[in-house]
Amino acid sequence: MLWFKNLMIYRLNRETSLSADELEKQLSPLAFTPCGSQDMAKTGWVPPMGSHSDAFTHVANNQILICARKEEKMLPSPVIKQALQAKIEKLEGEQHRKLKKTEKDSLKDEILHTLLPRAFSRFSQTYIWIDIANNLIVIDAASAKRAEDNLALLRKSLGSLPVVPLTFKNPIELTLTEWVRSGALPTGFALMDEAELKAILEEGGVIRCKKQDLVSDEIATHIEAGKCVTKLALDWEERIQFMLSDDGTFKRIKFSDTLREQNDDIDREDFAQRFDADFILMTGELSALINSTIEALGGEAEK
């Protein structure tokens, strides 16, 4: 079981009936297929349990897990540039004239056509958790672009997907700043030793703190000078540690050993049972964390 390291959270903005059976049928036409000789990249759905299952959905406790795989051909631009330059110089020498831009572009296409079949591939997988009970879609992605790319694939499979990023009533950075300034956090949350502070004015500086007592005179001085906390490392219930950003994303999630060991009594040889138990455990904890964080930050913005 791959435990999520990041949470990009989206709210389904109207009642949408997502059933696992229907989803299985909808994902199937866009199953992952490897790049052909002339493809730069291909993306599609794969079973979340890998070789242990043929199903494109894993379902437990009203939660659905799906997985997208992407293959990208690696063609470093210096390699293309070097091959193109050699070709241009050769032709210009033979024809005793400078090549036009359209001719150079055509040569570049020829080079790509020649190099692509020999290019190495890079593979990546992105897990998407559909929380039907709470009407959320949560993506394990570290960047908004990667999350949006995978949402686009899901939207293509479903036909439509009415989602919006999870947004809050109050600016997150003001709440985080107050937590650091006062040292008083909502029940269940505790400050760690890492944060990022930014000046409100764009031309102002950025302070990144690591292994730092955040409730200190030094940090207080930065806050008094007009800086806001835009990223803050937090501990929740001594079960999950994470970095909360001012855009509402959770990154660098780390589950406590105590939490991860809860299912150690299940035989690891029984992959399906352990995967299922870990998925139920992870989604239960993350659902509680998300709900606690929403409440701690003052609630969601009005729909």
From Swiss-Prot:
Q: What is its main location?
A: cytoplasm
Q: Name one GO molecular function term.
A: double-stranded DNA binding
Q: Which Pfam families match?
A: RdgC
Asked if Lipid metabolism is a keyword of the record, the answer is no
* InterPro entries on file: RdgC
Where is this gene product found?
A: Cytoplasm, Nucleoid
Q: Give the record's GO biological process terms.
A: DNA recombination; regulation of DNA recombination
Cite the entry's keywords alphabetically: Cytoplasm, DNA recombination
Any one of the GO CC terms:
bacterial nucleoid
Give the family from UniProt. Belongs to the RdgC family.
Q: What does this protein do?
A: May be involved in recombination.
Q: Which HAMAP family match?
A: RdgC (MF_00194)
Recorded protein name is: Recombination-associated protein RdgC
Organism, as annotated: Photorhabdus laumondii subsp. laumondii (strain DSM 15139 / CIP 105565 / TT01) (Photorhabdus luminescens subsp. laumondii)
